[in-house]
Amino acid sequence: MNIGDTAKLNTNPEDSPETILRLFVYGTLKRGYWNHQRFCAQARSIEPAVVWGRLYHLNAGFPAMEVPEGLILARGTADPLADARRQQEIGTPRFGRPTGDWDLIHGELVTFTDPQRDLPPIDRLEGFRPGGHSMYQRVMVAAGCRNASIAVWIYRMARVTNGERIDREWRG
């Protein structure tokens, strides 16, 4: 996949750029899975996207992903609006294959217009606590979507120790 074009995805004149937050989901938050309706019903849009990483099916029955440390653009905070602004500041990151044993992971790009309402419940679901011990960390990476590169937030595990590595896409 050649991702090099700059593109504005899902823009709406009523949305302030500072309030748009894009989240890449690869598991139970995807359409058709048990957490989607509860946590993503308020999304402005949802579309296919890809990121680089290693995907695992955990023994607990849900997925986790590792992402290359060198691809992390920012780390999540307890301030959803600051995180949305940071995403806008990053702009169009480079999306390229990292060195090492990484896969192109397929998931969905979920665009929210009210990060203060939408992000804290997902952070709680994922066990993300900025500055504390977290099950998942929310980090920003580059994603490929519609032949464009875009900065997205993603929940990742620093190291997966209790799951089976799977290829490309989690299907439950």
Regions found by a protein language model. Give the residues of each.
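Glycine-aromatic micro-motifs
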Residues: N2-G172
